[in-house]
Amino acid sequence: MQTLKKFIKYYKPYKTVFFIDLLCATIISAIDLAFPQLLRTLTKTLFAGAPGKIISALIPITIGLLVAYIIQTACRYYVTYAGHMMGARMERDMRKELFDQYEKLSFSYYDQNNSGQMMSKLVSDLFDISELAHHGPENLFISLIKIIGSFIFLFMINRMLAVPMLILVVLMLVFSYGQNKKMQETFMDNRRKIGDINSSLQDTLAGIRVVQSFANERIEQEKFNRSNENFLISKDANYRCMGSFMSGNAFFQGMMYLVTLVFGGFLIAHGRMEASDLAMYALYIGIFISPIQILVELTEMMQKGLSGFRRFLEVVETEPDIVDAADAKPLKNVKGSVCYEDVSFHYSDDDTPVLSHVSFEIPAGKSIALVGPSGSGKTTICSLLPRFYDVTEGRVAIDGNDVRKLTLESLRSQIGLVSQDVYLFGGSIKDNIAYGKPDATMDEIVDAAKKANIHDFIMELPDKYDTFVGERGTRLSGGQKQRISIARVFLKNPPVLILDEATSALDNESERFIQKSLEELAKDRTTITIAHRLSTIRNADEILVVADCGIAERGTHEELLALDGIYARYYDMSR
């Protein structure tokens, strides 16, 4: 019931269309219900009279019915067009809400959830929700009107024959309720299994170069086939439930005709019913059964739609871990001093400490470098500054302001990030550079490209800055992609910079180009650099050696070599 209440609120912006839609549905149903009763009345009164009287009455009857069917046709058009558009607009609204929520959710959510499942919720689930949004209330309303209306007429025609019909309807409702619960479980399982297929497909397509380079196509096919077979098994269980549901309802519908024929014949034989009334009874049984068949189909649609809506709610009702505090203020006039005060951190789903009582300061415009083994917490330290995660204990401050007391937008707009995992969007080189400042002029984009040492390469391309980079920048080399990402940060022009192993995946020649760009980028900015190649950080104002959840050593390059500890050992190994 709570799910239905939440679903109904999405009708609110379209309540006028919704109520007109229901009014049109009422008119359609009323005309369908009125015709057999009109025919019964005419058969017993007018058509039993003189031929001349019958012929003279046909003209007004024809005009009246023609007007009624024209009105019904107009109502059907409105229900079909406006009703579907209402569902499509609700789907649009939900898709926007879901996408906006994906944009708000914290890194911890993406650490624990699969993007294939998220895509399934954004596309497949919302399509089923849209179908339910339009057809659900309309079909339910029409069906109820026809069922109730036809039953009233059945009682009016012959009460004795209506009693066994009522008993059959009650038995059918009890049967349908039991089958519905089973179908709901199988539809939810279907959703999960199709999400698994999407996940498997996305993994394979995103990593197709790795798959083919290792000649592991067969392994990926086997993984996909397992997901595909699991979906088939889930569908099998679903269709078994549907088969029982639909065949059971068809049996009860057949019983209604059987009872009408046998019990009606018995009543006619005993003079308690006229043969013409039995014919009308059969017509109303047809009108009664038709909406039942619609409700049977609606049950499948409702289970799909509500299952999708529950999955939709799972996302939109998830509270992001990282949000603006109630008293958050914008970060202004940034100088760039950074301070980590007794910082400890562990992930929300794991109590194992990643950082323990880490403290250091970076004066504005100065640079520090973080070195240490993989998994020691270097990237985690950097992730706490723009609040990709929040500290468990202690605080991180910029210009003396606790980052948790600042608005996320103002904080992150002052921090530039260049990482080894470069992500370029499917578009042009110009679009990707301009991502750092969406309203940038062409001159600003070119200037940023020149500073990143990528302008000359771009000008050699046939389409220059309008060159399409391919999905994730597949048409460019690693070094070219990295320089575009650096140009993006030049354009953003932040006072604080994070360089997360920005050259670790590059060859020596590309690294020299990139290193020159990075040095230009870091000039007069507060910079945190993570590097495995120690030659790239020798000139840092301070180097921190991160190990065992904390800072094991700190000092300049020369001081750490003189200390002859962990850093000195790393340096010797790198030579």
How would you label these PLM feature ranges?
Residues 2, 11, 79, 83-87, ...:
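Juxtamembrane loop-to-helix connectors within ABC transporter transmembrane domains
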Residues 13, 17-27, 65-68, 138-189, ...:
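Transmembrane helices of ABC transporter permease
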Residues 18-78, 155-160, 271-275:
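Transmembrane helix-loop-helix hairpins at lipid-water interfaces of multipass membrane proteins
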Residues 64-72, 76, 169-173, 242-256, ...:
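Hydrophobic alpha-helical segments in the permease module
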Residues 98, 102, 211, 312, ...:
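Helix-loop junctions and hydrophobic alpha-helical segments within the transmembrane domains
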Residues 107-108, 124-133, 137, 141, ...:
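An intracellular "coupling" helix at the cytosolic face of ABC transporter transmembrane type-1 domains
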Residues 193, 216, 240, 288-315:
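Cytosolic ends of transmembrane helices, especially the final helix of ABC transmembrane type-1 domains
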Residues 331-575:
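ABC-type nucleotide-binding domain
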